[in-house]
Amino acid sequence: MISVGIVGGTGYTGVELLRILLRHPKAQVRVLTSRTEAGKPVADMFPNLRGHTDLQFSDLNIDALKECDVVFFATPHGVAMQHAKDLIAAGTKVIDLAADFRLQNLEQFEKWYGMEHACPDVLKDSVYGLTELNREKIKQAQVIGNPGCYPTTVQLGLAPLLKSAQALIETKNIIIDAKSGVSGAGRKASLGMIYSENADNFKAYGVAGHRHHPEIVEALENIAGKKDVFEGLLFVPHLVPMIRGMLSTIYVDLTEAGKQTDLQALYENFYANEKFVDVMPANSSPETRSVRGANELRIALYKPQPNKLIILAAQDNLVKGASGQAVQNMNLMFGFNEDEGLQGIGLLP
């Protein structure tokens, strides 16, 4: 049994981590911090956890966190990097659900997140936690940068094409049209997230530039093993009036080799042994409700024209897009079965 700390337990990803870890047979949450709710029983804030835990929120105490085997940071950007060096020096592993360890390019990080990185030496040795694509590195990691929710759908949606020995798609004109529920914006109060602003409404945001764009580009370059080939990539996220769920629609142009390839078979073979990636039959329509509460991502392919491919990827943004994938990474880091604590089935209807 490993001991776990969660920094930032009152946000959506923090409480989702707790919900998942309370069912984990080999992990016990011992520290759960909050800047504003120290001393309050968790079940008083989240009644779904009544009868499942007697934990109370506490102030952040670095010495208490050092006693844990692993610490998750479900915090705003910039928090994990302030504490990562002290924790790993004490032998504690770190999994950050914010962006502190996602981008290896410091210039891009500072541009998009508006802060100087506090520990570039730790960043250099950290591992990007897209589980299905970085499994062996994750097993050896001390610090994990958990991927963003949108980048998870994009990478898993495109990886079979980019990993192929042949160039199957034109990489300079990829279009990603992505939609997310409002929980992706976090739990803090803001005008744009209140009910009357989102109910009966559907809008694009971050059209001029979104923080996940450089993460997507850097990650795709690493998958493809090529630099500067995704300059023309377009990424537009949208907010839909639901709490959980994410659907990315990815449009690509096929090369001559791509036109001749059985792309359905390519995807099915690529993900044949993956427990959390479901390749649906061709021309299916993955629904967000089918993965609600589950650590699964469903993919479907359409080929509307000989030289066009549409990839649909659906996930729960709080689970496979955040906390579930973080626990998946924890399992690898400690030699557990990858699906420990993650066998939950999506809630439908």
From Swiss-Prot:
Active-site residues, record numbering mapped to chain: 149
Top enzyme class: oxidoreductase
Cellular compartments per GO CC: cytoplasm
Protein localization: Cytoplasm
InterPro entries xrefs: AGPR_AS, AGPR_type-1, NAD(P)-bd_dom_sf, NAGSA_dehydrogenase, Semialdehyde_DH_NAD-bd
Keywords, ordered alphabetically: Amino-acid biosynthesis, Arginine biosynthesis, Cytoplasm, NADP, Oxidoreductase
GO molecular function, one term: N-acetyl-gamma-glutamyl-phosphate reductase activity
Pfam families found in the cross-reference section: Semialdhyde_dh (PF01118), Semialdhyde_dhC_1 (PF22698)
Main location: cytoplasm
SMART domains reported for this sequence: Semialdhyde_dh
PROSITE patterns documented for this protein: ARGC
GO biological process terms held by the UniProt record: L-arginine biosynthetic process
UniProt EC number: 1.2.1.38
Catalytic activity: N-acetyl-L-glutamate 5-semialdehyde + phosphate + NADP(+) = N-acetyl-L-glutamyl 5-phosphate + NADPH + H(+)
Highest taxon, organism lineage: Bacteria
Associated pathway: Amino-acid biosynthesis; L-arginine biosynthesis; N(2)-acetyl-L-ornithine from L-glutamate: step 3/4
Its job: Catalyzes the NADPH-dependent reduction of N-acetyl-5-glutamyl phosphate to yield N-acetyl-L-glutamate 5-semialdehyde.
Record-stated family: Belongs to the NAGSA dehydrogenase family. Type 1 subfamily.
Protein name in the entry: N-acetyl-gamma-glutamyl-phosphate reductase
Lineage summary: Bacteria, Pseudomonadati, Pseudomonadota, Gammaproteobacteria, Moraxellales
